[in-house]
Amino acid sequence: MLLLAALLCGCGTDENSGEDVRAHYENISGFSAHVKILSETNDFTMAFELDYAYNKEDVDVFTITGPESVSGVSGSIAGDSEATLALQYDDLVLDDARPVRPGMTPADAVFGVVCALRDTPADESWRESADGTALTVLHYRSESGDETIEKLVWLREDNMQPVYAELFADGTRELSIRFKSYQENGG
């Protein structure tokens, strides 16, 4: 739906932005972010907040900060797009908690977005503006089993920092991610 709205509002395309973004994310060593994730599956909607640290050379780590019922659960993600996920709360560790649909759960959605930005050519890109901020929007589409997975990612045009992302399965939005803070560690 957002793609259709972008096309109807006459937003211009930017053919080079996808490759520029890939180069940028291939060269950063890491970042830290605070994100809000809205998970919408079937008739159930739940909001999560988490602190996420991406480390190109090691494992990514996150800690859920909300809602209170799961606050303090932490996790680590190691590898690439076929990563392993471990969850931990106090002394209890659940190793290899790999989701059935990698990149489509609140625990590994940020990781899935980073993998797309870093490793995958965007299927299309265009420019938008929100609240006076110029944004680059990237659209990724892939097949996973018998379903189509799509990711839309909005980045600030001036520094390529992620602002927002939406993840779809077979045309239905299942996750939205709002980056509330973001700080790169360097290249």
What is each residue range found by the language model?
Residues 1-4:
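Sec-dependent signal peptide recognition
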Residues 6-56, 69, 186:
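N-terminal leader/targeting segments and the immediate start of mature chains
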Residues 23-24, 50-55, 75-76, 123-131, ...:
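Short, exposed beta-strand/loop patches in secreted or surface proteins that constitute
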Residues 98-137, 148-149:
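C-terminal low-complexity, charged extensions that often adopt amphipathic alpha-helices
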